[in-house]
């Protein structure tokens, strides 16, 4: 894993330990990282930070709003935002991923994910999006 990545990532994860690892992994790789502890704070951080390139979110979170519901709201605000869904229940994310199958801006990863792969996947998503015409 190289530490020469660039971009701003919003990490939305309710489990403090998982969130800390994700943030450290992405910062070490060179990304700027904004944290949120649930979908409500994720939506707020997204509205406050228009420079966000990608939302890396857990799918299942307490508090009523799931990562999928939050992602749908974010996509209404910015249809070009990149979203990486992380879940131990990948079938829960399949509906949104299937719906966006013709779009390169949504992907899913199974938990536990490999911390050596995620930064490269995110960098690849950002590079691909910046190469595509809007």
Predicted regions and their residues:
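Non-catalytic signal-transmission and effector/linker regions of two-component phosphorelay proteins
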Residues: 1-10, 16, 75-76, 80, ...
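Two-component/phosphorelay signaling modules centered on CheY-like receiver
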Residues: 16-34, 106, 125
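Acidic, metal-coordinating helix/loop segments flanking the phosphotransfer/catalytic sites
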Residues: 23, 35-54
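Acidic catalytic/metal-coordinating carboxylates
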Residues: 38-41, 63-70
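His-Asp phosphorelay/catalytic-motif detector in bacterial-type signaling
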Residues: 51-53, 76-84
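Active-site residues of response regulator receiver
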Residues: 58-59
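Hydrophobic/aromatic residues positioned on beta-strands within the core alpha/beta folds
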Residues: 86-88
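A Lys-centered signature of the CheY-like receiver
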Residues: 109-111
């Amino acid at each position: 894993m190289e530490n020469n990545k660039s971009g701003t990532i919003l990490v939305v994860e309710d489990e403090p330990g998982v969130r800390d690892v994700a943030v450290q992994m992405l910062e070490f790789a060179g990304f700027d990282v904004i944290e949120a502890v649930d979908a409500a704070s994720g939506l707020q951080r997204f509205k406050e930070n228009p420079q966000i390139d990608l939302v890396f979110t857990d799918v299942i979170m307490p508090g009523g709003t799931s990562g999928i519901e939050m992602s749908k709201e974010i996509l209404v605000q910015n249809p070009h935002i990149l979203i990486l869904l992380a879940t131990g229940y990948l079938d829960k994310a399949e509906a949104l991923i299937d719906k966006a199958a013709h779009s390169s801006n949504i992907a899913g990863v199974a938990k536990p994910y490999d911390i050596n792969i995620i930064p490269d996947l995110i960098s690849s998503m950002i590079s691909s999006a910046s190469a595509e015409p809007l």
